[in-house]
Every structure is written in structure tokens, then in C-alpha cells.
Amino acid sequence: MGNTFGSLFRITTFGESHGGGVGVIIDGCPPRLEISPEEIQVDLDRRRPGQSKITTPRKEADQCEILSGVFEGKTLGTPIAILVRNKDARSQDYNEMAVKYRPSHADATYEAKYGIRNWQGGGRSSARETIGRVAAGAIAKKILAQFNGVEIVAYVKSIQDIEATVDSNTVTLEQVESNIVRCPDEECAEKMIERIDQVLRQKDSIGGVVECAIRNAPKGLGEPVFDKLEADLAKAMMSLPATKGFEFGSGFAGTLLTGSQHNDEYYLDEAGEWRTRTNRSGGVQGGISNGEPIIMRIAFKPTATIGQEQKTVSNIGEETTLAAKGRHDPCVLPRAVPMVEAMAALVLCDHLLRFQAQCKTL
């Protein structure tokens, strides 16, 4: 249970970190969309391990294979199956974790729920599960771009107390990808890289915030009450590994304002369309998109698996210690950026198809 996401554009991810591979089944993709493995690979390369000195040294090419649902470069409207094979698993690094639980990891809770767990690489709780999401997100991005020129750009906003100044209305993918930490503020990026280097040497980890901007989203996406657009985005983001917080629009800072200060006043643009002069609502009002940029921030905790010795317990009821072996990110933020973009794209694409089905039929 809990392995499927979406309503009309629906994905199911599968696989474990040290199994034969990981992947995704995509159901509900419109037919005749031109798509190639190379297009999907672009985002998978942004997510893959071993890409820089501040990410896990695990070396995986993460080459995607499209097994079904695409013929002669176009989608068929049938389920699309995408597989990425695991090539560089070192399961022996996890032998100690077969018995000992990693503090703040999913080891103990998975075993409490199922009575069994795959301790090799964390199994299903590993961030390698997100490969399927990123692959599906690449397809969703293309649908959104072709429909309304929708553009999704995520970037590292902060790491610990180092916070970047970024204009979410104008930031580009090229600026985000200009450095290994994926922060478009070059001065802050250098400080972030230095901080990650520091904790890596200390066998520790750190967290931070990814900000995501969705531009050119049409008005009308989202459903009243339980399927509000920001509610679905929150669920999507909080389903990612290591997430601990979600903020939309003005977020918690909005609680410091009065209604007259916070309200986004309307005006008519040159084309006679209503717009808002400010965007404290974050592009969504009443759970429905208003045509302004959709802005959100996601907090990621420090990576749970660290090399420092910590107190823990074993699954045979003993108090013990653990200094985790294996290869792990000292900071998940740089590789979380394409994951955030993918989940945003999946939500927007699903709501776009729902909007078309309900409101564009007559």
C-alpha cells in the first residue's frame, strides 16, 4: 500500500536500493506525446549519485530503459514502464544494520509495521525509490510545457543558516545548474559547499530548504476542499525522503501580517485579465490556481545515516551503538532539487488532466 500517487496521471514506483533495479509504471499519460529515453535521462542525471564531491560516492549511471507504452518515439496511451538497474550496490556495508537500527531512519518503524525489512541499503526507504518519480516527472514536465508553457524551477534556498537571495520569478535552470550545490546565488553557493565539505569530514550531515517556483500555470487547477492544489502539493513534497516541513506562499511569515497587509489586491492587465499585484497567496486561492507563480518551500532534515557513533538498540532487544558504514549524502539538498521538481510536475499534470476532464468537456 502507499506506492501509487495521482488520480488521472497515476504513477506506481517499485524496487529497492540494493535489489535488481528500481522504476515506475505510469498510467494515464495522454497518447501521441513525443518522448525519448534521452529526455528522461536529463533529470535522472541531475538526481543520480556520485555526481560531485558533496554527494554520495556511490557510482550509478542510472540509465533508464523504457519497457512499454512508447512506440516509435510516441506514447501510446497505455501504461509506460521505466526501469533503472542497480549496478553499484555494496550490501556488505550494511551487515551491522541487519540487527542495529539507525537513529531517525526508517529501519525500526518498517520492522515495527511489517515484522520484516530489507536492511540492505534501506530497501524501499532509500532515496533510490525517487528514481521512478523523477522519470515520471520528466514526462509530466513535457506535457505541462506543451500545454501552457508551464515551467518548474527548484533550487537550494538555504543550508543550515546560510540563506540565498533568489528571485523566484526570474531564476533559470541554467543558474541553478551553474554549481554543484544547485543554489543560484553564487556567493551563498560557495559557503554552502564549504559547509557540506566540513560536515563530511566530521562524518556528520546537515539539512536545509529547497524552494520551488511553478510559472505559467493556468488559472483553475485544483479542487475544492480535500483536493486543494496546495494540499496535494504538500502531500507530494512530504512524501519525499527526509522532508520535515512544507511552506506555501507567505507561509509562516504571513502570520505576522494583518489582512490588509497580506491580501493580494487585484488589477486588470493590458489584456483585460485579472491579476494580483502581490503574490503572498503563492499562486493559489481557495485551493485553485490563480495564474500567478506557485511558490513553495520544503524543509529537508540532515541525512540520518552518518559515520559518527550513536546510541541505538538492536532488534534483539539490546542497547548498543552504531557508526554507520556505507556511502551516503552528507546533505540531500543538491540531489533533492530534481525530486521536488518531479513531484510538482506530477501534481500539476494530474490536476491539468482533471481540469480538462471536468471543465473543458462542453
Curated annotation (Swiss-Prot):
Chemical reaction(s) catalysed: 5-O-(1-carboxyvinyl)-3-phosphoshikimate = chorismate + phosphate
Residues that hold NADP(+) according to the record: 47
A molecular function (GO) term: FMN binding
Keywords annotated in UniProt: Amino-acid biosynthesis, Aromatic amino acid biosynthesis, FAD, Flavoprotein, FMN, Lyase, NADP
PROSITE patterns found in the cross-reference section: CHORISMATE_SYNTHASE_1, CHORISMATE_SYNTHASE_2, CHORISMATE_SYNTHASE_3
Domain of life assignment: Bacteria
Subunit note: Homotetramer.
Protein name, entry field: Chorismate synthase
Lineage of origin: Bacteria, Bacillati, Cyanobacteriota, Cyanophyceae, Synechococcales
